[in-house]
A protein has these predicted regions:
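Short active-site neighborhood of thiol/selenol oxidoreductases, capturing the structured segment around
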Residues: 52-75, 79
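N-terminal targeting signals for export/organelle localization
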Residues: 1-38, 42, 192-193
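Short loop/turn microsegments at loop-to-beta-strand junctions
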Residues: 36-37, 59, 157-158
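Thiol/disulfide oxidoreductase modules built on the thioredoxin-like
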Residues: 130-185
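A short beta-strand-turn-helix
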Residues: 39-59, 83-86
């Protein structure tokens, strides 16, 4: 009797189990496109930033944290490449980095972090309650993964939500898309009234 099919089946089951074990929990469905999303947060200077204050602008929202070891720098680097590829159209966009870790991401830390990727990226924060409301509004999950001592990671959603000039969810982009595809998507949204 050959044990090869049994071994292959066990390996596949083990990999599937690992994938489920490390999958984000408590996921919230992403909101449907087309609806305006009210929210209220603060920038790193303490200024109020709301959905209404951003009307008339095409907004790129990314939720992450400064201590993120891999996904956040990758996605913010992607946002920066897309912004550079937009050329002069970049002036008509507002890229925002919203923290999922207000405990460690102080306004001072955020102020120095976001522009490292691109000078147009502004960081936003808020109280845990304000952030939880924004997470719910945009279907973002974020939870602390305990580590040793004060070291921990955040398990969070990772996509870039694009809002049109009326504050409606118009698209979702991310580093799995080509730069050209995201630029085309943004230019289409920028061209719409």
């Amino acid at each position: 009797m050959s044990f090869r099919p049994v071994i292959i089946s066990l390996v596949v089951l083990a990999l599937a189990g690992l994938a489920l074990a490390f999958a984000p929990t408590g996921t919230t469905a992403r909101p449907d496109q087309g609806d305006a999303r009210p929210f209220q947060l603060r920038d790193t200077d303490g200024n109020l930033v709301t959905d209404t204050s951003l009307r008339g602008q095409v907004v790129l929202l990314y939720f992450g944290y400064t201590f993120c070891p891999d996904v956040c720098p990758t996605e913010l680097g992607y946002v920066a490449r897309v912004l550079r590829a937009l050329g002069d159209d970049v002036e008509r966009t507002t890229p925002l980095f919203v923290t999922v870790d207000p405990e460690r991401d102080t306004p001072e830390l955020l102020k120095g972090y976001a522009p490292l990727f691109h000078p147009r990226i502004r960081a936003l924060t808020g109280t845990p309650e304000e952030l939880a409301a924004v997470f719910k509004t945009f279907g973002v999950t974020a939870r602390k993964v305990p580590g040793a001592g004060s070291h921990y990671l955040m398990d969070h959603s990772s996509s870039i939500t694009v809002l049109d000039r009326q504050g409606r969810v118009a698209a979702t982009i991310g580093s799995t898309d080509t730069i050209a595809r995201s630029v085309t998507t943004l230019r289409d949204i920028l061209g719409k009234p």
